[in-house]
């Protein structure tokens, strides 16, 4: 369960960062934003693999490699950004649970401190493009 939760965080956090970057309106995200999101997920997965955390679900990392599974993931990300159900699953959750998102972010960054020199350029770029957690709390409040 521990490994699954870590990989879940690795997948969710780039979505969270993009949500906050776009003011919780993923319709504002560009194709380049969504590519950056998937590259950031890949960075986070590689970090966990570097920490010897077993991939859970088994084989999930293959969905980030070129091929049919990756095409499906891109389609899901596009749907998440362009549909009401996608907004409900992502932006509404970020809007109403900023404390939870910040806690998840803090916990993941604690893991990253174990390998401080491990390169995660896309993950760090997307993180740097969102408002600070202080700004997010001011905008959305502590609705956890």
For the regions a language model picked out, list residue spans one by one.
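Active-site-proximal catalytic alpha-helix in oxidoreductases
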Residues: 2-27, 32-45
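NAD(P)-dependent Rossmann-like dehydrogenase/reductase catalytic/cofactor-binding core
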Residues: 45, 49-144
């Amino acid at each position: 369960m521990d490994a699954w939760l870590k990989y879940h965080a690795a997948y969710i956090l780039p979505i969270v960062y993009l949500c906050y970057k776009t003011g919780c309106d993923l319709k504002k995200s560009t194709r380049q934003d969504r590519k950056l999101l998937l590259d950031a997920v890949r960075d986070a997965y590689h970090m966990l693999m570097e920490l010897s955390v077993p991939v859970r679900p088994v084989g999930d990392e293959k969905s980030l490699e070129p091929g049919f599974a990756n095409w499906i993931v891109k389609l899901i990300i596009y749907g998440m950004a362009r549909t009401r159900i996608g907004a409900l699953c992502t932006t509404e959750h970020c809007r109403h649970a900023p404390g939870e998102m910040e806690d998840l972010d803090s916990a993941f960054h604690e893991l990253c401190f174990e390998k401080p020199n491990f390169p995660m350029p896309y993950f760090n770029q997307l993180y740097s493009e969102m408002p600070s957690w202080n700004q997010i709390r001011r905008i959305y409040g502590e609705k956890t």
